[in-house]
């Protein structure tokens, strides 16, 4: 009887084991990075397209200066209507050096002009609250005390410039793979935050945004979930 002894397979060295584990993890991470990089490219592409479109649109609106159908109210003491686009532009901000085309945000700024300044007359006790709300609404103003013949302050009078400063900011959130759109003073004295999928920031959405600015439609507000409404609603 002949016995044949099979040679044992050499056990991998400790360094070989580390190498195998390292290579496996590198492969997993590379596979995970691929959709992440694709998501980043989708977000950056959407932001650049939005900037180019808004830059041209605001240039045309600044020339045309169309009427705006919104009515802006602040409490029961100030109302601006009969508005029109006065000026506006689009801008962007990049991330730090070495980040390529990655954008920190895209923003559209514009001003609405009313026909005449507003005058708000309130009691001295209400003056501090009114001043705070005027500042929160980004309105420019100056105030003076109204004094009677006995040198007693009867009212505080605010002279408010007939200009509403508004903005729309597109800010990427790469972790959530979303684009947050912050509207400030667009259709009221208030800030609203919407959360968009990158693919949803397309030309039809931007068209709806301009229609919202002009007061022609509020369809833009229904294109994405409402992420946040500023806890201080300055218009009420």
Predicted regions and their residues:
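A composition-biased, non-transmembrane "mature-region" signal
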Residues: 2-236
